[in-house]
Amino acid sequence: MQSTMKMFGIILMVIFSVSCGPSAPQMKTREVAERTHKCSLVRGTCKSECNSWEYKYNYCHTEPCCVVREYKRMEKLLSTPKYTT
């Protein structure tokens, strides 16, 4: 009777320890989904390689998240005072 209770206890411990928390593939899938979501938040796309006008933000799964570089005007040249004589 005691040996069957010990075996039952061991089996329950194994079942509970294995079933706790997400498995490794589920965590990997969740990380990939979060990275892809972050990529879409910065208006990027997950592609095999980035073009010259894009930069790598982070990696979605194995491919980079490519974000388009924005054109920024040079405010310094536009805001310089004009001198008149």
UniProtKB/Swiss-Prot annotation:
PANTHER family found in the cross-reference section: BETA-DEFENSIN 113
Pfam (any one): Defensin_beta_2
Transmembrane segments: none
Disulfide bonds: 39-65, 46-60, 50-66
Cellular component terms per the entry's GO annotation: extracellular region
Organism encoding this protein: Mus musculus (Mouse)
Keywords of this entry: Antibiotic, Antimicrobial, Defensin, Disulfide bond, Secreted, Signal
Keyword field contains Protein transport: no
Localisation per UniProt entry: Secreted
Lineage of producing organism: Eukaryota, Metazoa, Chordata, Craniata, Vertebrata
Signal peptide (UniProt feature, chain positions): 1-23
Free-text function comment from the UniProt entry: Has antibacterial activity.
GO terms (BP aspect): defense response to bacterium; innate immune response
Membership in a protein family: Belongs to the beta-defensin family.
Encoding gene per record: Defb18
InterPro entries, per the entry: Beta_defensin_dom
Protein name listed in UniProt: Beta-defensin 18
